[in-house]
């Protein structure tokens, strides 16, 4: 009788352990969201953007001859933007993405140290010039995607861009000391992103480097703080939160 009760108790324990193991296994399994998304050939998205930008500066030979401008330093400045995403699937690993329209509000600062500031032109020994840009852009990227792991995936991308600055001449009439920027810029971009799958959308935080290849300095010998600069190239780090479906 004792052995029979012992066997029944052991059987109950085995059943309870099996049920607990099955429950834990079922709880541990994640639901796969948007399982058919990889079958889409084309899908849309929208991106919310924060950017930090600066100018890569190359001095004009006149800078060495200047006795008034001692130092010109480019500085970082932040901005925001919105973008539409159009993605076409080429293969399980590769996609091509066009970002249009992309609207960026960007700022670039130059700090001047002057030896002989002109009070008549409201100049100071140290003065900063904020250059505002409103950029309409068209970046095109090739994306390389990893395998999907549950509701997560990593991707890398690279490509080119063209940008048109709506504010390049917005303040050209105000002061002699302005630095003018050209309207059109071309550049290259590269970055990395992460797909997080949710029941009705994909959230993709992304970071990219965006470097302009064009000299965007619109040289004007009449501008006091411009003629010591030869070339200006745009440099930007872009953080995006992308919502896709």
Positions of the model-derived regions?
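Outer-membrane beta-barrel channels and translocator barrels
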Residues: 39, 91, 147-151, 197-199, ...
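Residues that define the transmembrane beta-barrel architecture of outer-membrane proteins
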Residues: 40-42, 76-80, 132-136, 152, ...
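Residues on the lipid-exposed face of transmembrane beta-strands in outer-membrane beta-barrel proteins
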Residues: 46-50, 82-88, 100-102, 138-144, ...
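Repeated loop/turn-to-beta-strand initiation elements of outer-membrane beta-barrel proteins
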Residues: 54, 93-96, 150, 200-203
